[in-house]
Amino acid sequence: MIKLKNVSLVFQGGSVAISNLTTIVQEGEFVYLVGHSGSGKSSFLKLLYKEYFATKGEIEVANIDVSKLPKWKIPLLRRKIGIVTQEPQLLENRNTFENIAFALEVMGALPEEIEAKTNTLLDLVELNDSAYK
């Protein structure tokens, strides 16, 4: 679960990227960030990934207070968040199943976990027929 409570991000010079954002994203929930250029979409993600630090407010990811997270734990935090960008990149030498499984492989997941989670995602987006294309 991701929780943001009264989160603001103001850059040096006073430019406001995010102002008093409060929201909850449940585990397994899909969220689409849509908005004009400069509306704070990327800044929101960078706050979650701890690339940016909130000017005020509280951010929790998987019950972890991001503001108190030591630097060495940031990669562990980032593994708990999945992001698909507007221009997804696919590896040409891999089929659909292998492209979906790639992130799990990199994270060191066990083969049976990779198989199960990848099949679940294929079901979710109705791509079972294209898994090995």
Predicted regions mapped to residue ranges:
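ABC ATPase nucleotide-binding domain signature
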Residues: 80-81, 85-89, 94
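ABC ATPase NBD coupling module
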Residues: 66-82
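Helix-to-loop junction immediately C-terminal to a conserved catalytic motif
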Residues: 49
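Short coil-to-helix segment of the ABC ATPase nucleotide-binding domain corresponding to the Q-loop/switch region
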Residues: 93-101
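The feature captures the beta-strand-to-loop junction immediately N-terminal to the Walker
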Residues: 34-36
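Conserved ABC ATPase "signature" region
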Residues: 64-65, 105, 112-130
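A short, flexible loop at the N-terminus of ABC-type nucleotide-binding domains that lies
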Residues: 1-4, 9-20, 70-73
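Conserved ABC transporter NBD signature motif
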Residues: 57-65, 77, 117
